[in-house]
Amino acid sequence: MNDRMILVVDDETELLEMVRSIFMRAGFTQVLTASSGEAALKVCKEKQPDMVILDVMMPGMDGFATLKELRRISKIPVLMLTARGEAEDKFAGFENGADDYLLKPFLPKELLFRVQAILKRAYPGKDRKVFFDTATVDL
């Protein structure tokens, strides 16, 4: 079980539900969704999620503008999950503060691995374990 709060932002309802389901099946207990950049910023201010998975192409405030505003107010880790795969798009994501950039379509397992790696780097003091022979100690 993972109690980290993940916010998934995309204007496609089916994709939101699919990504939410992927994380719930993987043991994440708090997976929030937002269908616009504006809604995502509101959720981030109110709920303070541990990580955001953010689409680029959305009506109104796109993912790059959302990321730029999010970086102005927070250091929440962000993974861009988008169909925009041109080098310039990736560079824009990283220049605006994205922690990772993954193209659609994606492999669910790859998304999970990337998110888990980002969370480990962003919150290194949490979820630490020490192994002694057959015993495991949570620090």
Which residues fall in each region the model found?
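Two-component/phosphorelay signaling modules centered on CheY-like receiver
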Residues: 13-32
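Receiver (REC) domain active-site loop signature in two-component systems and cognate sites
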Residues: 58
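Short amphipathic alpha-helix used as the core "switch/output" element in two-component signaling
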Residues: 42, 62-75
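Short, Lys/Arg-enriched segments at the junction into DNA-binding effector domains
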Residues: 4-5, 117-139
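Active-site residues of response regulator receiver
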Residues: 10, 55, 82
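Acidic catalytic/metal-coordinating carboxylates
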Residues: 36-39, 62-65, 89
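Acidic, metal-coordinating helix/loop segments flanking the phosphotransfer/catalytic sites
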Residues: 33-51
